[in-house]
């Protein structure tokens, strides 16, 4: 995962530390100096801030005190509850925080070797498709000798303050962290993909089936090393930090630190009883203000759970900001959940593995419509197909597909007034099985994302076997920006960008000819096929000038629905297109019949129901069955 970590701004941690040790000085980062520029990008500075090294704040500074825990963190003055919640989630995953905080034992203060300390640290974050190594010095902003931003329970523990400083450096300054998105931080810590879920819109509080499905997915994400966050939407500024009667706080991002089914009852009977309760453990980054409803720390509901089960769950009676809730109550009181999947691409794992395709792209503007790549969403039909297009394949009868589009992070450009995200999204279309060139007309929409001005947009969808085109867009045309497209499938999807609008002219075109006609053939299905005891296991093959497209086998039916399409760029207009129907057998497939399609561009009857014919008979003789075919032809190769 970290075989190729890129030094951020070309600062090499090892070389810088070596140089400081040689010169016996503490590192001072010239790219993130101890000045107001590193604190704010606008507005008037508050109280006089003094930058201090940990040794100037306490006697015995440490990266970690008694290990790392989600209890370590407390939010400071900046409105980065979202980042602190993500850190709380990170702290509960040793395999993840050790990647964000690399070689932590070497970075830790060593009281026995005080001269080895160089005042320099480094941290890894996933940034727009690659891992970056961010170097910082250890000077931290304080007021009255107190850290003003993220800090630990222990006065001499500094891991969270240093991680926050490195993240602020990526963002441009501390103020740029104000009002961010937990989903972004979770992705930056893991390289995974975040899926936001609107609990209110999905009506999870009242729909038990949907709620149970969501809990199972959260259980799977948590058990496989993912990170989860929950929050209550603050609709107005007055709502921010508003505490509800139940003890929860609006506008706060709560870290989910455990997901489990809790066994109710006592003794041996409880072990064999099937009654279990879906429960979630959460933590408030403020470190206090807990839930006071059912299953809160001191509630009588805990009497239903055995002492051993409570100990296993780590139930404590203290106002430490961590508490349990039933998942039903979570769905009733919270409005949003963010699941960050840590995508498993290792083939050595016992869990499901994914194949990832990762492509960089951009929305760009050009006077030539063929070169313009900033067409806006489908509302703008005249320019929509000018957007970037990416083709991928689903190679199983049905597969779960995860798609994420991320625009280049904008926080570091806030100082120049360019820090706002574009509203982005994407549509997915099922296309012909042999498409190699860009789409120019609408086809069946297989799925679509929401459009939102967040850094990332995610979609999970189940799709049948076939070929698909993703069209990522900005909501309005005329906007420019870079993006990263990530597509996860069970088997390799051969995802790639479609760059050409039509077959290219080559040196062979004058000798072999160039296409004069484009024809799209859509075989919908067949009816009345030759009887067999179990029904036909049929498939179709569409042939044209040496190119062919084959459908999947439709088992046990004489009225199959093939729903297969092919696109053909034709040079020999007098040569018909052939559609053959076959019956799949163990030893040898059986020919059931065929039809020939002239597919002239002036044929206005686009939908045809044709009788199957024998292929060898000179006289046209009908065989059992008909095939339904939709045909579209044009002399403009950019018509389809």
Curated annotation (Swiss-Prot):
Enzyme active site: 81, 252, 284
Keyword flag Protein biosynthesis: no
CC annotations in GO: cell surface; cytoplasm; extracellular exosome; focal adhesion; synapse
Domain C2 positions: 499-614
UniProt KW keywords: Disease variant, Hydrolase, Protease, Thiol protease
Start and end residues of each Calpain catalytic domain: 26-343
Disease affiliated with this protein: Vitreoretinopathy, neovascular inflammatory: An autoimmune condition of the eye that sequentially mimics uveitis, retinitis pigmentosa, and proliferative diabetic retinopathy as it progresses to complete blindness. Patients present during the second or third decade of life with posterior uveitis and reduction of the electroretinogram b-wave. They become more symptomatic when cataracts, cystoid macular edema, and disk edema diminish visual acuity during the second stage.
UniProt protein name: Calpain-5
Underlying gene: CAPN5
